[in-house]
Amino acid sequence: MLHCITTIFLSISRMTMEDGPIAESYFTAYADVCFREFGNHVKFWTTINEANVFTIGGYNDGTSPPGRCSNCSSGNSSTETYIVGHNLLLAHASVSRLYQQKYKDKQGGSVGFSLYAFEFIPQTSSSKDDEIAIQRAKDFFYGWILGPLTFGDYPDEMKRAVGSRLPIFSKEESEQVKGSSDFIGIMHYFPALVENIKLKPSLSRNTDFYSDMGVSLTYLGNFSGFGYDVFPWAMESVLEYIKQTYGNPPVYILENGTPMKPDLELQQKDTRRIEYLQAYIGAVLKAVRNGSDTRGYFV
């Protein structure tokens, strides 16, 4: 039987996710329509697509909708990134609660949450500072989302670094968010080199997600648009980290793959992508054999 996973929220430019309660109520009402109209055909739902990089791109960097950042015409990278991430988690919990109460028994589906998953490796293999920085990067990219979904709160390191700019879950909100995702969806393409950075006091006021994290990232791979480099070990490592750190939740790989140069002969043979998929599916198989509860792979 063929199953599909349907994403409710892909990218919304007009819905201001920095306005928490209003956006949460609208999003829940929108999800209600989706469940009612399509729930008999869709058994796997993801509420938010790539929640971490969506928020960073839209509210820290300003490179994706709605294009807000400190250096943009409007926005504040030091606060809005965390406010929006917080509101996305609360909106997800509201939608998950709606499904559990109104549709779960009748439709028998599942509601999950997705994030972009990098594998992080040290810029300098002998650098202890870079090794420590890797954990900070994981706390910010993974723990920011999976911490509340698994434990009901943000990682301690993130709370220390961001301070009062990081929203606080009430006891009720923490209980609602914790355990609200039936599965975790991940998007993965390539790893990143991590270098520890120390900001000079004179620059410390220009805070954003990356300066709070205290790392510089260099993405590995060929980004020409005609094929990504192959790092299957990175996929295996990501799945192992999620297994060990967040209680081995059910995982679906929702995005992976590589583009191809528009060449008819290459497209007919497609050898590169066959080899790519063999390598990555093999890495997923290794992770599953090592205990990862990975249940699906999409390209």
From Swiss-Prot:
It is an enzyme of class 3 (hydrolase). A beta-D-glucoside binds at residues 49-50, 189, 255. Glycans are attached at residues 71, 76, 222, 290. InterPro entries: Glyco_hydro_1, Glycoside_hydrolase_SF. One of its GO terms (molecular function) is beta-glucosidase activity. The keyword Transcription does not apply. It catalyses: Hydrolysis of terminal, non-reducing beta-D-glucosyl residues with release of beta-D-glucose. Keywords: Disulfide bond, Glycoprotein, Glycosidase, Hydrolase, Signal. The active site is at 50 (proton donor), 255 (nucleophile). Belongs to the glycosyl hydrolase 1 family. PANTHER family: BETA-GLUCOSIDASE 1-RELATED, GLYCOSYL HYDROLASE. This is Putative beta-glucosidase 2. The gene is BGLU2.
